[in-house]
Amino acid sequence: MAFYPLQIAGLVLGFLGMVGTLATTLLPQWRVSAFIGSNIIVFERIWEGLWMNCVRQAKARLQCKFYSSMLALSPALEAARALMCVAVALSLIALIIGICGMKKIQCTGSNERAKAYLLGTSGVLFILTGIFVLIPVCWTANIIIRDFYNPAVHVGQKRELGAALFLGWASVAVLFIAGGLLCGFCCCNRKKQRDGYPAPRPSMPRTDERRRNMTRQSETPTSYV
């Protein structure tokens, strides 16, 4: 199977995208406190994530608290949780399928076509993972920016984009590249297999053979004794 380095690059990037997706899901720095106007309190930072909020004060340790009630969460936060959990599961499944489709792995024997289809499926799942990560990250960023410029929102309630959002965007880019590499490998492998088999030569019909034989016989001069 050709393009073996392409397989390695796609799976390595997919693994990095999976790690980035998991880190984005767990990190609390989705929304961080904004220091604007009269809210310049630099010795206290507030982080809000999908699962917990944290307060970090000067000369004090970081204190984090999980959200106590599921019913008290906003619909946007619940949807972001669900999408990120699905993204983590999809990335793990994509990585396992991609490993099974590797050249050196004998899960499918020596069937190159089956291995190519497995790698193509892995690439599609990595792209789907990127989409599932992109939706909550962009959604949350849109809410933060909208509230930041909304004069009706109190200054103390305004938030800025946290590091987890930037990590999520980077993970989406890596997942898209990984999926593109694996899908491209699958397409190239199918094209190579299709071009590798020569087209069968058309067989001459029997009627044409008989007609040619009759023509030759008629052209042969007849000798008379």
UniProtKB/Swiss-Prot annotation:
Location of region: Disordered: 194-225
Major location (coarse): other
Annotated GO biological process: bicellular tight junction assembly; cell adhesion; paracellular transport
Biased composition range(s): Polar residues: 215-225
Membrane spanning residue stretches: 8-28, 82-102, 125-145, 165-185
Keyword Transport attributed: yes
Catalytic activity: chloride(in) = chloride(out); hydrogencarbonate(in) = hydrogencarbonate(out); bromide(in) = bromide(out); iodide(out) = iodide(in)
Record text on subunit structure and interactions: Does not form homotypic polymeric strands and it is not sufficient to form tight junctions by its own. Interacts with OCLN.
PANTHER family: CLAUDIN
Protein name: Claudin-17
Organism the protein comes from: Sus scrofa (Pig)
